[in-house]
Every structure is written in C-alpha cells, then in structure tokens.
Regions:
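A metal-dependent hydrolase metal-coordination microenvironment
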Residues: 1-132, 137-191
C-alpha cells in the first residue's frame, strides 16, 4: 500500500471566535506554505464550516471544526466532523454527543499550566480517560510557549518564540498512551 506524508496545521482560530484572521487569510497562508491541510477550531461554534470552509480550498484540505470546553472553561476538546455543537455540559456529555454525530474528539492542551499574564490562564484537562476520546493533543505550541510567561520576559518570547518551546509534555503523552487513538500536535494560533 503506498503511503504519503501530509503536512498541515491543526488547532487554529479565526475571527469567528478569538482569532484575528479570516478563514480566507488562513487558507491563503496555508497554501503559500505548501500545507496539505488546515484544522480550524473556533471556540464553541461551527461558523467556518457553515460559511463553506470545510473541504478543499486553494489546494488545502480544510477541517472546519470547533473547540469545546466544560462549564469551568477547562477540559477543552478539538472537534472535527460533527454537524452540531453540544451544549456546554460536562466533558463526558460533550464527548458522547460528538461520537453520536460521527465526529472526532481530541483532548486539547491537557497539561497546560498557563502564564502569569492576564487572560493567559491554564485550560488543562482534568477529567482523565473518558469514553469518546479519539486522540490527544500531546503538544500544543501556544501552551508550551506561554508556560511561565511574565511581563518581564514577554518581549524575549515574542522576539524568539521557538526558544521557549520544548515539545510534547510527558503528561500529555501519558494520557495519550492511556486513551489510545491519535496523537497530534497543534499550534493553537490566534493570529497571523
């Protein structure tokens, strides 16, 4: 069976939630970079999908999904392939709804510790292994970058972001090994 390597980016946000770019701008950038796929995960909505962005655009396969959370704003789930957004309930209920609609559910940034900056708190996964988890985001660029960030070192982090990231969190890898399914890395980009 022939195999091919596909290169893409998962876990990006658009203006349909808290991102700064439009889906068109992100798809254009992805095409310019030679990416094969782009995973859009706007918070608690499917507006990118409803606006027709799911499918192939400019040679890039766009996975127009969502990012869910529980009532505590923690326990985030990346969702692809679901036709509806479940109500804000506990994670188990959301996972069951996604599974029943034929969607794919990936635990997002499970070991995030956050930064010591406004609006950059942690959004970890604290629910353990639950039925309906199809995979784990074992590495999240934004979560890794913002870990321990302070106003004092923010300028250095912006000037050289890669110096502040290290790769998959061991706890996230452990969760993936417990749950099975796919292991993914995401950028969690909110701007261009």
């Amino acid at each position: 069976m022939p195999s091919a390597e596909l290169v893409g980016v998962l876990h990006v946000h658009t203006r349909f939630s808290d991102g700064t770019a439009t889906p068109a701008e992100l798809v254009s950038l992805a095409a310019d970079m030679g990416l094969d796929f782009l995973g859009i995960n706007d918070h608690r909505n499917l507006k990118a999908r409803e606006a027709g962005w799911a499918g192939r655009h400019s040679g890039v396969v766009v996975l127009a999904g969502s990012e869910l959370n529980d009532p505590t704003r923690a326990n985030h789930i990346l969702v692809y392939g679901a036709d509806t957004i479940p109500p804000v309930t506990d994670s188990a209920g959301q996972l069951a709804t996604v599974a029943s609609s034929g969607g794919l559910a990936i635990v997002a940034h499970p070991c995030e510790t956050g930064a010591r900056l406004p609006k950059m708190g942690p959004y970890p996964w604290n629910r353990g292994v639950l039925p309906g988890i199809d995979g784990v985001e074992v590495w999240n660029y934004m979560s890794d970058w913002k870990t321990g960030a302070t106003l004092r070192d923010l300028r250095r982090r912006v000037a050289d972001p890669d110096a502040f990231v290290g790769g998959p969190h061991p706890g996230a890898v452990d969760l993936w090994l417990e749950t099975g399914g796919c292991a993914v890395g995401g950028v969690d980009a909110h701007g261009l």
